[in-house]
Amino acid sequence: LVVGAVIGGIVAMRVEMTGMPQLVAALHSFVGLAAVFIGINSDIVPPEGLAGAEKIIHEVEIFVGVFIGAITFTGSVVAYGKLSGVLDGKPLTLPGRNLLNVGMVLISLYLGYLYMGHAGSWTLWVMTAIAFIFGLHMVLAIGGADMPVVVSMLNSYSGWAAAATGFLLGNDLLIVTGALVGASGAILSYIMCKAMNRNFISVIFGGWGTTTGPQIEVEGEMIATDVTTVSSDLKEANDIIIVPGYGMAVAQAQSAVSELTRRLRGMGKQVRFAIHPVAGRLPGHMNVLLAEAKVPYDIVLEMDEINDDFPNTDTVI
């Protein structure tokens, strides 16, 4: 425990805020791998005295824990690769990918039936391999723009993996905390998909049920600007909304934005921040950056709180 805590503390302190999404994905992978190891260990060395219904329940706990854990592990590894730039952020679209996903799930369920029918541990090992491949394929098929949802989704999976492990070990605390993490991650993923006008099932299965429709024509005219023009607009504006995105994190510009906000407010102008649910690379990314730069919390608003104010705003950055 001490060694792990020290290593984790050192890694967390050395990681910059721009690398936090990758760290979160890596930590999710550890939870999934731990669930796989614990489940397989419990199969190799089962508790004594189990028979009848108790034995079947124990086998279900092993199977579910290993299945979710394996998906979480490989999915998180791919998410880490995409977020860090090691892997291409474009979705991998294999022919018949949806049928492939369904096939892997059905085969895993059949192997679970065989496993509980005392067919042997080989069914668990084969299912583990399939779940590893399923996790890889599922996240590889999701594009980089949906990565915030993927991180939240993997957070949910890691929670359910922990809960399944809690049932396996008879640990009530692990069950409760895992269920809380799993449920909150699932709800957050749904909220983020709704904010993106995306279908939740479509995102997590890498385009399930989506079709390519006619391209929407952009209305209006795009006008280029420069620093001088923006500075002049800000001086003349009384009501200003700043909408931060991942570019602020990459440029580490949160302190400069905070200083700009301080000066504008000192001139008597109203400055507020509008936070989109999927801004950045993980949930709450922009909120953490702005808090780090000491931007007042009361002017940082969620999309639903400020969306109706845009038509009456003088300038939006």
Question: Can you name each region flagged by the protein language model?
Answer:
Residues 10-21, 36-53, 118-119:
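Transmembrane alpha-helix boundary signature
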Residues 143, 157-201:
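Mobile "lid/hinge" segments at catalytic clefts and subdomain interfaces of large enzymes
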Residues 57-67, 123-127, 169-185:
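Loop-to-transmembrane alpha-helix initiation sites
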Residues 6-24, 76-91, 134-147, 189-193:
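C-terminal ends of transmembrane helices
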Residues 19-31, 91-101, 148-156:
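Cytoplasmic-side transmembrane-helix entry/capping segments in multi-pass membrane proteins
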Residues 218-316:
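Structured cytosolic domains appended to multi-pass membrane proteins
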Residues 3-4, 8, 12, 30-35, ...:
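Alpha-helical transmembrane segments in multi-pass membrane proteins
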Residues 180-237:
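Membrane-interfacial segments at transmembrane helix termini in multi-pass membrane proteins
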